[in-house]
Each structure stands twice: as structure tokens, then as C-alpha cells.
Amino acid sequence: PENPLNVPEVETTTARLARHTGTVIHSALQAIVESKLVTNHECITADAFINQQHSFWKIQLQQLGWHGDNLTRALQKIAQSIRTSLGSEQGRWLLNSDHQQSACELSLMQKNKHDVSESIIDRTFVTEGIRWIVDYKSSEPESGETETAFIAREMETYKEQLLRYQKLLAATEPRPIKTALYLV
């Protein structure tokens, strides 16, 4: 085992802020899809959504213990992620609620030898006969890391997770399945 003494790992303030910010971003993207704010015929503007949700995000982060500069940075990251997502054709395609079998935070259970494990898929849908499985990531390149190196590192880090999701859904349907990371 990686941690045979079961010693708790100490999470840095930066890592904890990034994790909490990512959770709020996931919830915001889920709200966009489930509220049908992006469809084949219309799309909410990023500024309208940010203005509508900003106070809610602030309260969520404050309840998690964030204040001052950290709170400001987190809110800026969330707003930028929404602007990037709603401002790009790829982001609007991903968040389009008109896709067939559209779902967010899809929970799948898998029985193992001695227990049951849960996998939660951030975003999935079917378009043109293909099942898409998308995992959102709000991480950022390390200092001095090129964009190409960052993307390669993220793909390597999450490859097994995406393959597990693909295998779980492949057991339930015969259609082709594609997986993707969406870096917000």
C-alpha cells in the first residue's frame, strides 16, 4: 500500500483552494446543463450567468472557509472558467443540453470481489451515434510548464480513470464511446 501506516496527508492551502474552486466550477457547469442554458437555439451569456451566480459561489466558498485574497482568486478562476466555456464553440457544444441522453454527475456502481465502488462521470451524452464521456479539470500548468507538457501530464494522470468510465458504460450499451478531458 502507498500509505501503510494510514497517516493523513497534509493538504496545502493552495491545493485545498484549488480543490474547492474546482468543485464550484463543476457545480456551475452542471447547473448550466441541467438548467438548459445552452441549447441548439440559444445560449446564456457568460456575464449573465456569472452575475446570476456570483453571490451563490461566494457563499459556497465562504462556507468552506475562504475569505480575502483567496476568495477573490477563487471567484476569478470560476468566472474565467465560465467565460472560457461559454465563449468557445467547443465549450458550448459540451454544455448543450439538447444532446441525447444528456447527464451530469452520472453515478455508476461497480461490484468488485469484496465491495462496491462508485464512479461519477462529470458529463456524458450521445451525439451522432457516439457516447461521449467528459471529465472536467480545473488544474493549471505548473510554473514554467508548457501548455503541451501540461496537457500531456493531465492526459497521462487521468487516462486510467477515463478508461474505467469507458469500460463501465461499454458494459451497458453497444455504441462507440469516446472520452475526453475538458480543461476549464
Language model region names:
Residues P1-I130, Y158-T172, K178-V184:
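Nuclease catalytic cores
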Residues D135-E154:
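Short beta-strand-loop-alpha-helix junction that forms the active-site gateway
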